[in-house]
């Protein structure tokens, strides 16, 4: 069986040096605290509603208090989309 020709290697060229790039995080320092606050407010709203048997946080809303709690949680997820 015939042997393959050996290819000649090209001269060595060093890889280009990598330069440090600045990563701009933006001025979104408010996002994480607001997001966590919304999550916790929503969770607390629902827990208080169940623990007090519906008399708190707002008695007139009745079972809509659950929707308000989940609304706060959904708003927290909405704020989380701004996190970079």
Curated annotation (Swiss-Prot):
InterPro entries: CrgA (IPR009619). It is found in: Cell membrane. It comes from the Bacteria. Pfam families: CrgA. HAMAP family: CrgA. Belongs to the CrgA family. This is Cell division protein CrgA. It comes from Streptomyces avermitilis (strain ATCC 31267 / DSM 46492 / JCM 5070 / NBRC 14893 / NCIMB 12804 / NRRL 8165 / MA-4680).
């Amino acid at each position: 069986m015939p042997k393959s020709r050996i290819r000649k290697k090209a001269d060595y060229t060093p890889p280009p040096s990598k330069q440090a790039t600045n990563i701009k995080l933006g001025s979104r320092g408010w996002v994480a605290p607001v997001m966590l606050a919304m999550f916790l407010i929503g969770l607390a709203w629902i827990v208080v509603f169940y623990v007090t048997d519906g008399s708190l946080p707002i008695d007139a809303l009745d079972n809509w208090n659950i929707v308000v709690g989940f609304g706060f949680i959904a708003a927290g997820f909405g704020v989380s989309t701004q996190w970079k």
